[in-house]
């Protein structure tokens, strides 16, 4: 079967020019119909809307975490927040529909407060999670709760104050700034996805965009070149080497994996080097 060595980039930002983070995957891909279909699925962003797909484990879970990290890096910065919302016994919903109404009301109050303070509308990704008890398997119940990744000009106190019903707090609300240093995006994605058997419902507001996927490059690397890089740690983790390959970008992390069928693959995480002396960013 004929193969090519593909470079696929995931540029995380509103535009290619202002993006400050990107991931690069370098790997072997077949040119047959089945390989093309698999490649199309791999490069299709996960929407993170509605319920999780039925099969959300193994490879699918790994792929979901990667896309969630990219979605966060594309839309949020250290100025944005992660808010956890829980329920007291009095307000604990009995159905998913009620929990959905509660989070919609929370977002509506945020929009109202932003409008009153002449702030842009909030942008958010929300995750509602719960689990029913199952005596046969020993599975314990998990109460309804929500996670909200939020871009909003309101103070943290104002954000937390929106979690109420008829002016009465519905439970505990805790709002913290996002930490976007090394490994923190993965940690947050793992935290929100660590229980794949629980029921999840995702929501994203208008304004949340997917990462930018430039056209893949099938001529930049050779199979022998990928193997040489992957098997030599001095090259794999050499920032100067990758800076020449991707001008304007600085290596954060490099990983190499070997597959018995496809051979070596490389995954890079990179930050944009700050602009200097008025020179435009390279992309």
What is each of the regions a protein language model found here?
Residues 1-142, 152-283:
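Right-hand nucleic-acid polymerase module
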């Amino acid at each position: 079967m004929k193969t090519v060595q593909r470079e696929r980039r995931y540029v995380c930002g509103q535009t290619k020019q202002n993006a400050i983070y990107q991931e690069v995957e370098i790997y072997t891909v077949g040119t047959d119909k089945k390989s093309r279909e698999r490649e199309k699925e791999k490069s299709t962003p996960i929407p993170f809307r509605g319920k999780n797909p039925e099969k959300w484990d193994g490879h699918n879970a790994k792929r979901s975490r990667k896309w969630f990290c990219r979605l966060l890096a594309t839309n949020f910065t250290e100025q944005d927040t992660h808010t956890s919302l829980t329920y007291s016994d009095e307000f604990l919903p009995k159905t998913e529909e009620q929990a959905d109404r509660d989070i919609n009301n929370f977002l509506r109050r945020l929009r109202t407060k932003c409008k009153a303070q002449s702030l842009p509308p909030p942008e958010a990704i929300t995750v509602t999670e719960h689990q029913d008890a199952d005596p046969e398997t020993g599975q314990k119940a998990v109460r309804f709760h929500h996670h909200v990744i939020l871009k909003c000009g309101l103070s943290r106190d104002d954000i937390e104050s929106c979690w109420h019903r008829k002016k009465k707090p519905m439970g505990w609300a805790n709002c913290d700034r996002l930490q976007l240093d090394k490994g923190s995006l993965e940690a947050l994605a793992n935290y929100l996805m660590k229980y794949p058997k629980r029921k999840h419902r995702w929501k994203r507001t208008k304004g949340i965009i997917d990462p930018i996927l430039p056209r893949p490059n099938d001529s930049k690397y050779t199979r022998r070149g990928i193997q040489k890089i992957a098997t030599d740690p001095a090259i794999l983790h050499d920032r100067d080497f990758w800076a020449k390959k991707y001008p304007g970008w600085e290596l954060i992390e490099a990983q190499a994996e070997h597959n018995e069928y496809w051979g070596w693959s490389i995954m890079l995480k990179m930050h944009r080097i700050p602009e200097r002396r008025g020179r435009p960013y390279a992309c």
